[in-house]
Amino acid sequence: MVNGFTKFKERFQGFENQYVIIGGTACDLIMENEELPFRATKDVDIVLIVESITAEFGRQFWEYVKEAGYEHLNKSTGNAQFYRFTSPKSKEYPYMIEIFSRNPDFIILEDDAVLTPLPIDDEISSLSAILLNEAYYELLKTGQMMVDGIPVLSPTCLIPFKAKAWLDLKERKLNGEQVDSKNIKKHKNDVFRLAQLITANTRQVLSSEIAEDMKKFLSEIADETVDLKSLAVNNSGLKIRNV
């Protein structure tokens, strides 16, 4: 589990319908719950459910950030917002929290609050595009599950999100954009890690748009080399190619 996540969980009890954990932390919590290994991760990726968000959550979150003493407070610009908080005063708090909101005004800031501009890297740009897509946002809202009292995106929904991120970053790199190849590989490998949780009875309803993205992913991934042994993934990971 991510360092400091226990305190985060305790602080936001009662707000479980207002946010969902995605990304590596969601994968880590799910895999740990199934007693399966996952890669190390130090950041917590949070998406706010704008239809449910309350001013009280925003106040509580800002109080939590101040309590943690995060050294770096960053905010992106634009209609949708990314906030990044890094380097807390102790390991009782996650090293990094990244929070995404389709509504830029969810946090109630104090007058003396200083948030520096957040550089838009490939990961932020890609995730923003995915979450602003209505089909993926609807999947996020309907595809949650609770793991030890924490709302996370379920494995069958994390896989399409990871697949879409892989397709998006791969295309951006082919088009000449500056994209870290490690991020592309990370999403691909995570799909195979999560595929261990897929059974013959697993079902997930997808919109036509997301279904087409998954078909494209499965077609393109067939040409990729994946070292399942190094990922500590058993051969059941191969089933993703046969979905």
Report each predicted region and the residues it spans.
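Compositionally biased terminal segments of proteins
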Residues: 1-243
